[in-house]
């Protein structure tokens, strides 16, 4: 019988699954549940060593002799500090070592309870990774716990070998051993390249070929990659390709970009039917909340993330494999290894998404964004500020020769204008910037320098506050909400824009917009940058947005 603590069960099951076999066990009360469970697994060879300082070096010897990582488990408090010399040796000798420490719950650290000290990250820079496991009470806790353990074990041999530290908080009661079996756990694997000299990848291709519903989701990529013609058809026909404008031209063919609205419109039955069996991802962040929710609720059997840095990014909660290589090299490598069995899955997605209409709304924030996007000259660069701007732009088709930029690393509203101005300063193309009022005024000092030219066209959407916050569930429109959440204001950019040498234009309605859009989007060279400030009504903006999405829901009823 094993401990009933789920974080312990996850840890032990993953040590076993990752092939860790040699474990040094130090006596103690707080770690007794871990020790008891480890000692009762036949796959492990356990060694009892009382002195933790000696135990750490003993574990180094085990690892050196076997090649794979060995583990050492100790109780809480100063016992852990006694492993420090061995951890330092393992780090500088590059020996894979897993240090497992039991701990009290965080609430009792520093409260004069016995045998306690702040254990997370106690080894500082002398370990490759340090993780503090959650105590598992929810499904999300269990997913988080599983991910942390996978990350730590994989890190022992990633880009060189070395020690890692796994800290395991354990609440009372500690000594309940009621679990009859170890749980079935998700094991994350890593391929460092696809080379027969590094790791046999035939098994990987066999896994890929057994699925019919294959999807690729591409996140933000600040580049353009044109696939050679010979790769385009073999790759394109086998997958449903989804990306956003921020993915730019990084797909072998024409991708599906309106999937956010499409997923929102689907019935539960259609969502289930169109869910992928395997998901491959590359690139950075995805804006779509609908896609994140969809793939978390309908997880594929496998999720492979392809990234040159090999880091674990489990956005959809179902990651199974990390492939550490350039994503384009990966795709070109597998292109001719894919089987030729017919699949209708890509067409299912293409045909359904073609039924989703673009917004055709009255004068509003969304309609203004759509009008500019349709009028963009090619080639040019389009910079999208965060919050509503980047989301609403996704509802429209962007011309193919338009490069898209956005600060989606942390997704804050600050710095959107400064980043765009900096980009334009080194660009020979026209640079269009769509930005909301809060983001613009927050970053208005972006124009307080001399390092920009006439190739800048700023579309400032001013509805006197952050209207997107009123679309959030539970947000009322009281005076307090308007003041503290929407941050209502009555500011205009006119004086600042003209002071900084911009041609300023003001729009308050559809006719003025039509008149201003032609000079604003003209590719003709001008002597000054331009700022077009468009005023809309935030109540109308949110109402029209809701009506559009309500119409999508009704299309299948």
UniProtKB/Swiss-Prot annotation:
Domain of life where this protein originates: Bacteria
Annotated catalysed reactions: isochorismate + 2-oxoglutarate + H(+) = 5-enolpyruvoyl-6-hydroxy-2-succinyl-cyclohex-3-ene-1-carboxylate + CO2
Keyword Cell membrane included in the entry's annotation: no
CDD domains (alphabetical): TPP_PYR_MenD, TPP_SHCHC_synthase
Pathway: Quinol/quinone metabolism; 1,4-dihydroxy-2-naphthoate biosynthesis; 1,4-dihydroxy-2-naphthoate from chorismate: step 2/7; Quinol/quinone metabolism; menaquinone biosynthesis
Entry EC number(s): 2.2.1.9
A matching Pfam family: TPP_enzyme_N
Cofactor(s) required, per the database record: Mg(2+); Mn(2+); thiamine diphosphate
Gene Ontology BP terms: menaquinone biosynthetic process
Keywords: Magnesium, Manganese, Menaquinone biosynthesis, Metal-binding, Thiamine pyrophosphate, Transferase
Parts forming coiled coils: none
Cofactor binding mode and count: Binds 1 thiamine pyrophosphate per subunit.
InterPro entries assigned to the protein according to its UniProt record, in alphabetical order: MenaQ_synth_MenD, THDP-binding, Thiamin_PyroP_enz_TPP-bd_dom
GO MF annotation terms: 2-succinyl-5-enolpyruvyl-6-hydroxy-3-cyclohexene-1-carboxylic-acid synthase activity; magnesium ion binding; manganese ion binding; thiamine pyrophosphate binding
NCBIfam families tied to this protein: menD
General function of this protein: Catalyzes the thiamine diphosphate-dependent decarboxylation of 2-oxoglutarate and the subsequent addition of the resulting succinic semialdehyde-thiamine pyrophosphate anion to isochorismate to yield 2-succinyl-5-enolpyruvyl-6-hydroxy-3-cyclohexene-1-carboxylate (SEPHCHC).
Entry-linked HAMAP family: MenD
Subunit structure: Homodimer.
Family: Belongs to the TPP enzyme family. MenD subfamily.
Name of the protein in its database record: 2-succinyl-5-enolpyruvyl-6-hydroxy-3-cyclohexene-1-carboxylate synthase
Gene designation per UniProt: menD
